[in-house]
Amino acid sequence: MRFCLILITALLLAGCSHHKAPPPNARLSDSITVIAGLNDQLQSWHGTPYRYGGMTRRGVDCSGFVVVTMRDRFDLQLPRETKQQASIGTQIDKDELLPGDLVFFKTGSGQNGLHVGIYDTNNQFIHASTSKGVMRSSLDNVYWQKNFWQARRI
């Protein structure tokens, strides 16, 4: 009986402490609008080659693509580097992702081993891939599953 009481108390306390993701920035609060903006951005930039330090259609890196997308589509100013982007907003669980959230990956070592994209919908994200340029990828892909680091809501 005592064990049951302790177990019930522990379960109630655990339920009260559940982390709830914060609401998105007001400019990202309408998922339909965000998805449309991300689709338009992908259509405009699809296939743009990867270029470290780039922020134009002649070449763009992952954090540059995030900066340009958030600025041009949602009027949001983000830091330029992936490491800085990984510290803004609030960290959220992967199962709480909403369109417009940032997804981060550890694809190598050191500061240059980080990668960032923007969550779209249906477990997909848009990003500037080093091998294929700007594209849409699935978080279900084994590579991205293995290297997933964190998600952040801005």
From Swiss-Prot:
Q: Where is the lipid attached (S-diacylglycerol cysteine)?
A: 16
Lipid link (N-palmitoyl cysteine) located at? 16
Question: Which residue range or ranges hold the NlpC/P60 domain?
Answer: 32-154
Record-annotated membrane-spanning stretches? none
GO biological process assignments? peptidoglycan turnover; proteolysis
Chief location: membrane
- Signal peptide coordinates: 1-15
The record, for Pfam families, names: NLPC_P60 (PF00877)
Q: Where is the active site?
A: 62 (nucleophile), 115 (proton acceptor), 127
GO CC, any one term: plasma membrane
Establish whether keyword Signal is in the entry.
yes
Name the Gene3D superfamilies for this protein: endopeptidase domain like (from Nostoc punctiforme) (3.90.1720.10)
Membrane topology category: Lipid-anchor
Q: What class of enzyme is it?
A: hydrolase
Q: What is its EC number?
A: 3.4.-.-
> What GO molecular functions are on record for this protein?
cysteine-type peptidase activity; endopeptidase activity
Q: Which of UniProt's keywords are assigned here?
A: Cell membrane, Hydrolase, Lipoprotein, Membrane, Palmitate, Protease, Signal, Thiol protease
Is Repeat a UniProt keyword of this protein?
no
Protein family = Belongs to the peptidase C40 family.
Q: What is this protein called?
A: Probable endopeptidase NlpC
Organism, scientific name: Escherichia coli (strain K12)
- What taxonomic classification does the UniProt entry list for its organism? Bacteria, Pseudomonadati, Pseudomonadota, Gammaproteobacteria, Enterobacterales
